[in-house]
Regions:
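Pocket-lining segment of extracytoplasmic ligand-binding domains
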Residues: 73, 149, 160-251
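Conserved C-terminal helix/tail region of periplasmic/extracytoplasmic solute-binding proteins
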Residues: 286-321
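Ligand-binding "clamshell"
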Residues: 4, 10-11, 78-92, 183-197, ...
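Secondary-structure end/capping motifs
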Residues: 216-296
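Short, low-complexity disordered leader/linker segments with a strong preference
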Residues: 1-14, 318-321
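Phosphate-coordinating loops and pocket residues in cytosolic domains that bind phosphorylated ligands
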Residues: 121, 186, 306
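Short, glycine-/small- and polar/acidic-enriched structural segments
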Residues: 9-147, 153-156, 172-178, 202
């Protein structure tokens, strides 16, 4: 009898997939590409939008989501504070690796803020306390002998409201997302003050995490999903598909294709082509967070990772071509 691959179930397994920003996270677009083999058969992905990784912790704890684009600090908080049984399963975004993009804190060009110390007394907009961007900003403040609680004020702002808030002078600095950030800098209206790379060197920005119970109960479906994800990422990254790829991503992120041409180039964050998570990189980021005093205790990331799912998926995707 021929070998049977993929998940076999009476109904496709529903995978509730959390993400927080488009087009950066790509998640809704991934599942609209024309190269998916298993979507709608062994599994169905249901993308769900969150403001940041940290609100996902509660959703994971309540079994309201199954997989999420997660930040290192959120992982540590989920494990140590919320006692969520969760695993790192795949790569998503790496910051500042090999000359690729690094998250940037922007200020108005005419704000008078010339260096980090000029942030004293200012309001900084972040998508969430404990998020990856928050961690890098605090690390930079500490490098300049500044206290994040005494010297500045952090304001939690959704990604979509960051630009309106700084335009209205309700905040003084924020991590404006691409592609708008690039356009505003070209127009001379804004400037980058510093990057996450400046603060911490190359780090893991986000990765895919999943509930352990869900992984155990649905291994075949998760591997199928990751195989599709790798195939979709490969297809989106292929210059031969650029026009259609940008059309799909633009439609899912409510942008124009022309405005997101930077995606999946060196002007974008680094994405591992086989989605292999950088466990050491995640550990480095968490250790920095721990040194900053954000965590009750240090965790060993390797103890909360299972790369067997993505390894099997990558092997299948390579064979499938």
């Amino acid at each position: 009898m021929p070998a049977i691959h993929g998940a076999r179930a009476a109904e496709p397994v529903k995978i509730r997939f959390a993400w927080s920003t488009m087009p950066t996270h790509l998640v809704p677009a991934i599942f609209k590409t024309p190269v998916l083999k298993h979507h709608g058969k062994s599994y169905i992905a249901e993308p769900q939008n969150f403001s940041a990784s940290t609100p996902m912790i509660t959703a994971f704890a309540a079994s309201q989501i199954d997989v999420g684009v997660f930040a290192p600090t959120a992982l540590a908080l989920a494990i140590t504070n919320a006692r969520v049984d969760i695993k790192v399963i795949a790569d998503s975004l790496q910051d500042g690796r090999g000359g690729y993009r690094s998250q940037t804190l922007y200020v108005k060009a005419n704000s008078g803020i010339k260096d980090v110390t000029d942030l004293k007394g200012k309001k900084i907009g972040v998508n969430g306390i404990g998020s990856a961007s928050y961690t890098s900003i605090v690390a930079m403040l500490r490098k300049h002998k500044m206290d994040e609680k005494r010297d500045v004020s952090f304001v939690e702002v959704t990604f979509s409201n960051m630009l309106p808030m700084i335009e209205d002078d309700k905040i003084d600095a924020t991590t404006i997302q691409m592609p708008m950030a690039e356009q505003l800098v070209k127009e001379g209206k804004y400037r980058g003050l510093f990057t996450s790379f400046d603060a911490m060197g190359p780090t893991v920005y986000n990765f895919l995490a999943a509930r352990t119970a869900f992984l155990t109960a649905n291994r075949a479906a998760v591997v199928d999903m990751l195989e599709d994800y790798i195939r979709a990422l490969r297809w989106l990254s292929d210059p031969a598909n650029k026009t259609e790829a940008l059309r799909i991503i633009a439609a899912e992120s409510k942008r124009t294709p022309e405005s997101i041409g930077y995606l999946l180039t060196k002007d974008d964050y680094y994405r591992d082509p086989n989605m292999v998570p950088d466990i050491e990189g995640i550990q480095k980021t968490i250790d920095i967070t721990n040194d900053l005093g954000f965590l009750a205790k240090r965790i060993e990331v390797a103890s909360y990772a299972d790369t067997s799912y993505v390894a099997e998926a990558a092997k299948r995707a390579a064979v499938a071509g």
